[in-house]
Structure formats: C-alpha cells, structure tokens
Amino acid sequence: DRPRVTDPATLAWLFYTSGTTGRSKGAMLSHRNLMAMTVAHLADFDSPDHNSSLVHGAPMSHGSGLYIPPYVLRGARQVIPSSAAFEPDEFLDLCEHHPGCSAFLAPTMVARLVQTGRPRPQTLRTIVYGGGPMYVDSLKKAMAAFGPIFVQLYGQGEAPMTITGLRRADHVDTDDAVLGSVGYARSGVDVAVLHEDGTPASAGEIGEIVCRGDVVMAGYWNNDDATRKTLQDGWLRTGDMGSFDERGFLTLRDRSKDVVISGGSNIYPREVEEILLEHPGVDEAGVVGAPDEEWGEVVVAFIVGSASPEELDTHLLERIARFKRPKRYEYIDELPKNSYGKVLKRELRERLA
C-alpha cells in the first residue's frame, strides 16, 4: 500500500501546558508545527544520526518528548530510564553506556548533575536546557564541570521548543549578558518585543515577547477565549516580558503575571533572584509580590539557604537599586515545583495570602 499523505494542518499532538500560572491548556500542535520544530532543531542545535542517543532525563510528556521527532527522523535511539524519573547517577550511567548522547533537561536537573561531582561521560555530547530560568552563576558552574556541551532554548508548548536559543558556540568566550540571555530567533521564526499599545520596542526597552512562524500552534483545545487572547494578528503572545539588545540577543525578564509593580515601578523577580543566587548562602530563591496598602505590592523573597536577612540586604544593596530589595524574606526547605522542575510562583503567593 502507498503511504498515506497527511495534511500538514492536521492535529498531531494535543500538548498540555505546564500550568504554572493557572489551569493547564491543550495546545493543538499540527504536523506542520512539529516539522517546523524538527527542522529548526536540526538547523540550529544538533545533527544526530543512527549512532546517536536521546536520553530522556526529563518527562517525555514535556520537552524531552517533543525532541523525539528530530532524533527519530535521523534514526537515533531513544533511551528511557528504568526509574521513570530523573536520578542524576542513573542518567550519567546511561550516558556512559550509550553512544552519542543528547538530552533535554530543566535547569534544576542540570544543577543536580553538577552536584554529583562526577565527570562528564565522554559520550554525553549535548545538553539542551530550558523550561525555566538558568541563572548565569549556575550555568558557569555547569560549564566548568561538563565543558562546552550546552545549548539553550526558549520556547513554549504553544511554539514547541522553538522561539529563541543559544548554540554551543554561543556559550564559549562570551560575556554574562549573552549567558544571561535566551539567545536569538530560531530558524523559521520571527520574534518581536511589543509595548502594550502594540508598537515595537527599541533595543533595551522591555515589552511582551511575541513570535510567529510555522511552529506556532493552531489554538487551544476547546478554549476559544484563550485562543483569541493568545493568537492575535498572526502573532503568538507569549505572556513573557523581555528586551532585545543591540546585538539581537533576547533577555527574558519575567512572566507578565509575575512582574511586581511597587509604587508604580516595575520590578522583575528574575533580576532579584539572579543576584540572590550569587550569595554563597543561598541555594534557591523565589521572588514574588505581596499586596501592600501603601505601595500596591512589595517584594518578598523565599529563600532556601543559610544567609541571614541582614547579609542578603547588604549583598543586594551593593548590586541593585534599593527599591528592588525584598521587604522581607521567608525561609523554606524547598521551593515548590511542578514535575518539570518549574517553580510554582502561584503557590508562593498563596503562602502569603
């Protein structure tokens, strides 16, 4: 029998978003979307063949599963841990056993690999990281431990794995501004930063990140209202705030829902978190806004670590404006995360209610 020809617009995958800001929604991904993602991955990041292996350290229901198509296309093997979970030692053992290994991992998973103290298996060729913020200090530690094998992606379920990125070479002999960015537009994707009125933001100006291209979903399953709000004039409104620099590198500031507005000034939690994590007494940090009668919102930092509030205040005031400093610190054993390693900011806000 002849192979059946499928309309590229046909629904191929109903991909549910991670739901970090609310109820999970089903992004309708077509065959065209998955092919555009596959072509961009092969063009920008990796070139697997029949001697390559994709090791599924992250859940296959999320980013790791979306990377199956480019590796299947090239005849690579799929390696699934028997634990069905991310165990750093098991992951490294699998990489030592299989040839030409690549993997998609959340930044928190990369940090756990570094914490093992084990050297990089020679067969571990590529780690693509994404799905959450990779702080510059954490990235430098990972590169010191494993070498120049890292690739960054910025994407969403609505534009699977494919908005911007940094190649391996972009991580080498560069500055912190590049390492702290999410790279430049991927192949076949247009990316822009827009003000609230829809006008383009200039270099250095912060606005909402939007993108368009064959990678963008058809809409949300049985959710026309959310589709209308997210897909406008051919652009996918990501809900993320960011800015381009003069070189074309995009820096992700925060989710628009996570921006703290205090006394009329926008405070971007990621900036504060990045600096908090530079302190040796901080293992994890999550910054959110808390309601305040006088200021509208004030900054609150949830800390996993031993540094005192006084030490953190001193550390911050040497590095950022005073109005961005947390008004209080909450110490917890671990930041709440979903199964993909993303910090659940809404749960942090609920703790303050």
Residue ranges and their predicted role:
Residues 24-26, 37-43, 67, 91-92, ...:
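Adenylate-forming
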Residues 35-53, 61-101, 116:
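Conserved AMP-binding/adenylation subdomain of ANL enzymes
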Residues 103, 213, 218-219, 229, ...:
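AMP-binding/adenylate-forming catalytic core of the ANL superfamily
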